[in-house]
């Protein structure tokens, strides 16, 4: 049984339908990427999973349980971690306070979980009292991921984690995601930086105009002439 399974998903915002029958699945321990052009519906697919886009049809199951249409908080409580593309930290709060907010499901911030995430992102441990809004873009992204990992979710959803980062920081960000996955967290990522995402992931899905176009192992998609020509710039 897949940890996450999406079948024939239709979703959107208000009366605007964006997805038209999208299918995807993520097995426990996998690292899966969703790529495609702007407006393909990549982020909408992820937001539908976490309850932030309107569910208009189809199935979404997490760990065998139907979560389609549930409020976001209920989905997070079931063990889905989510990091949105923007506005993903509390800028006026400190690093430590942001991490503490991530522990709301646990009641407090256990030392063990704090140590685990700071081992993953040691630079955050060097500045616990710094306001999140004063961190660099890359550091804010690390803080957002660290906060999402505090409750120890089995599945982590990342929406465009490299967006807005300087080119030399993109590979570093993907290194962090690799290590998160290597520690046993299942990862589903939406990424505009398609070549890097497909090179790093186990499997990938290519969406266009709200529909599935291709699905295969990451390396296979990278080497597919049609995928390269249509979606990867040749």
Outline where the language-model segments fall.
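The feature captures the beta-strand-to-loop junction immediately N-terminal to the Walker
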Residues: 35-37
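Helix-to-loop junction immediately C-terminal to a conserved catalytic motif
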Residues: 50
